[in-house]
Amino acid sequence: MTNSLFKQKLSPIKPGDPIDYKDVELLKKFITDRGKILPRRLTGLTAKQQRDLTTAVKRARIIALLPFVNPEG
């Protein structure tokens, strides 16, 4: 297997920018149509950004800004 299978994606979030759980439109970019959080190798985020993103998505789900699962999926 070569590294050509995965294209390097540029992160839409600049390093150092905060990831806010209230920014639902940004969080939706990192969630599949079934409601799962995309892995870091697909999002192009740094490890810290991916951890912050996961925390933000989970917080948004708990306060009902994002669904836990997609109703159509």
UniProtKB/Swiss-Prot annotation:
Any Gene Ontology biological process: translation
Gene Ontology MF annotations: small ribosomal subunit rRNA binding; structural constituent of ribosome
UniProt keyword annotations, A-Z: Ribonucleoprotein, Ribosomal protein, RNA-binding, rRNA-binding
Pfam families listed in its UniProt record: Ribosomal_S18
Superkingdom of source: Bacteria
InterPro entries, alphabetized: Ribosomal_bS18, Ribosomal_bS18_CS, Ribosomal_bS18_sf
Any GO CC annotation of this UniProt entry: cytosolic small ribosomal subunit
Record's subunit section: Part of the 30S ribosomal subunit. Forms a tight heterodimer with protein bS6.
UniProt family annotation: Belongs to the bacterial ribosomal protein bS18 family.
Task performed by this protein: Binds as a heterodimer with protein bS6 to the central domain of the 16S rRNA, where it helps stabilize the platform of the 30S subunit.
HAMAP family, per database record: Ribosomal_bS18
Name this polypeptide is given: Small ribosomal subunit protein bS18
Annotated organism of origin: Prochlorococcus marinus (strain NATL2A)
